[in-house]
């Protein structure tokens, strides 16, 4: 007699999201070196971070929300190389990051602008695990967009 299998889509979804939450928590633990512990704890469950750059006159730019991923002991996201944000970062502006919302508190980070198609694909996979629309193939980093110059990767690490 053949055993029947039973699949519960709701339970499968809940278990998948629980595994993702555990993975995000483990990735956030990798960031513990250098970032404030409360900041790292909030990153584990955050859907977006809020970022601002510093203008030439020393004032901060508008605070904007961005999707992000955690990999290789850093916070990563993408932006257009033509954005004000990217231009300021290329000239050496620090990036100020908040997890709780536009009002902070903010953590100052060091930024590396990266052009690497393989890393873009890896970040796309991280996004796909975190954001359902990225999982469906939309709004996710990719080798093609990075190598064509449509996006740059931004790697955020603690200011030492």
Where are these regions (language model features)?
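Short beta-strand segments
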Residues: 46-80, 95-98, 106-110
């Amino acid at each position: 007699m053949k055993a029947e299998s039973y699949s519960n889509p709701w339970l499968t979804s809940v278990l998948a999201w629980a595994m993702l939450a555990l993975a995000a928590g483990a990735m956030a633990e990798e960031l513990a070196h250098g970032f404030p512990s409360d900041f790292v704890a909030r990153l584990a469950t955050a859907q977006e971070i809020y970022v601002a750059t510093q203008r030439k006159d020393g004032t901060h730019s508008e605070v904007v929300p961005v999707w992000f991923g955690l990999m290789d002991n850093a916070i990563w996201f993408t932006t257009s190389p033509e954005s004000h944000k990217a231009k300021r970062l290329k000239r050496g502006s620090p990036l100020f990051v908040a997890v709780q919302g536009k009002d902070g508190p903010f953590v100052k980070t060091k930024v590396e602008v990266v052009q690497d198609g393989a890393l873009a694909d890896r970040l796309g996979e991280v996004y796909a695990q975190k954001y359902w629309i990225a999982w469906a193939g939309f709004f996710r980093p990719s080798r093609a967009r990075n190598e064509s110059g449509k996006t740059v990767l931004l790697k955020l690490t603690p200011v030492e």
